[in-house]
Amino acid sequence: MAPSSSPLRTTSETDEKYANVKWEELGFALTPIDYMYVAKCRQGESFTQGKIVPYGDISISPCSPILNYGQGLFEGLKAYRTEDDRIRIFRPDQNALRMQTGAERLCMTPPTLEQFVEAVKQTVLANKKWVPPPGKGTLYIRPLLLGSGATLGVAPAPEYTFLIYASPVGDYHKVSSGLNLKVDHKYHRAHSGGTGGVKSCTNYSPVVKSLLEAKSAGFSDVLFLDAATGRNIEELTACNIFIVKGNIVSTPPTSGTILPGVTRKSISELAHDIGYQVEERDVSVDELLEAEEVFCTGTAVVVKAVETVTFHDKKVKYRTGEAALSTKLHSMLTNIQMGVVEDKKGWMVDIDPCQG
């Protein structure tokens, strides 16, 4: 899938290495970039070659299943600029596979793994001046799969749109020490047999009420419990969770109600590499409150320590800082992503910034 020629030529011919952005002030907010990727296909067919087009609004039928019934998926991944000016993407194949799993659950037509990865590379290459300088942030990449064709009843869309846009970002959480979490015993994020295990667009707006209530009370984020028993922890609004006690690192299993995070998978492997016993199992609230350390993982948040957890009227403080495992794992992961150490895992996909 070759990129359309004129937009990429426009980008490569500019004399600017970087966009006009105050990189030191980046937060996790949208900064519109130059180009996006768009491809379409009919139900039962395959995606044809997509195009790099100017970033902007899209036209969509008011009868589309994405608008009426929430038939849509999204992914999130990042591109990094190294000190030797390489641009790298972290494990895009894993996002492609997760989108395919979600598409099967929502009866959608996904791009192939190769189409997905190539489209991500094209999008990054077209917007390479928006990849922040080393240590100043990352380019957050958001692939979307939308049921965009018109249909009135509840049914698979007759047409699908695969779209990728991006934005330079800084830290997701600005707190320097650790997160202060509220365990929500009122609302639930997912239930058995639902869509909690795929990155459906419908999973996220229902958590906003809980998140706003928590933030208004001074918390950083919300930790949800399982809907079946209300006794086991599941995940935050947009990231996975781990607890540490002794040499054992535990995280809830991805058995249908928890998103199988790419960062979660990577951190589990790194923790195992340095001698920790990693367990995927049900983790009760009682175990959470007795843990020595708690941290969360995700594309946006990377690896972030949890400083406190509040459940009802009980507040527990955890180990953070240089002595914390999360600090070591964060360093191990970001050193791979930024090219500080050799990528022996084969996780990174390099893009030549001189192409285009």
Swiss-Prot record:
One Pfam assignment: Aminotran_4
First-listed, main subcellular location of the protein, grouped into a coarse class: cytoplasm
Catalytic activities: L-leucine + 2-oxoglutarate = 4-methyl-2-oxopentanoate + L-glutamate; L-isoleucine + 2-oxoglutarate = (S)-3-methyl-2-oxopentanoate + L-glutamate; L-valine + 2-oxoglutarate = 3-methyl-2-oxobutanoate + L-glutamate
Cofactor(s), names only, from the UniProt record: pyridoxal 5'-phosphate
Xref: CDD domains: BCAT_beta_family
N6-(pyridoxal phosphate)lysine modification, residue list: K199
GO function terms (MF aspect): L-isoleucine-2-oxoglutarate transaminase activity; L-leucine-2-oxoglutarate transaminase activity; L-valine-2-oxoglutarate transaminase activity; methionine-oxo-acid transaminase activity
EC number(s) recorded for this UniProt protein: 2.6.1.42
Subcellular location: Cytoplasm
GO cellular component terms attached to this protein's record: cytosol
DNA repair listed as a keyword: no
Gene Ontology biological process terms, A to Z: glucosinolate biosynthetic process from homomethionine; isoleucine biosynthetic process; L-leucine biosynthetic process; L-methionine salvage; L-valine biosynthetic process
Enzyme's top EC category: transferase
Sorted UniProt keywords: Amino-acid biosynthesis, Aminotransferase, Branched-chain amino acid biosynthesis, Cytoplasm, Pyridoxal phosphate, Transferase
Transferase recorded as keyword: yes
Pathway recorded for this protein: Amino-acid biosynthesis; L-isoleucine biosynthesis; L-isoleucine from 2-oxobutanoate: step 4/4; Amino-acid biosynthesis; L-leucine biosynthesis; L-leucine from 3-methyl-2-oxobutanoate: step 4/4; Amino-acid biosynthesis; L-valine biosynthesis; L-valine from pyruvate: step 4/4
Domain of life: Eukaryota
Role summary: Converts 2-oxo acids to branched-chain amino acids. Acts on leucine, isoleucine and valine.
Family to which this protein belongs: Belongs to the class-IV pyridoxal-phosphate-dependent aminotransferase family.
NCBIfam families: ilvE_II (TIGR01123), PRK13357.1 (NF009897)
The protein's name: Branched-chain-amino-acid aminotransferase 6
Gene source species: Arabidopsis thaliana
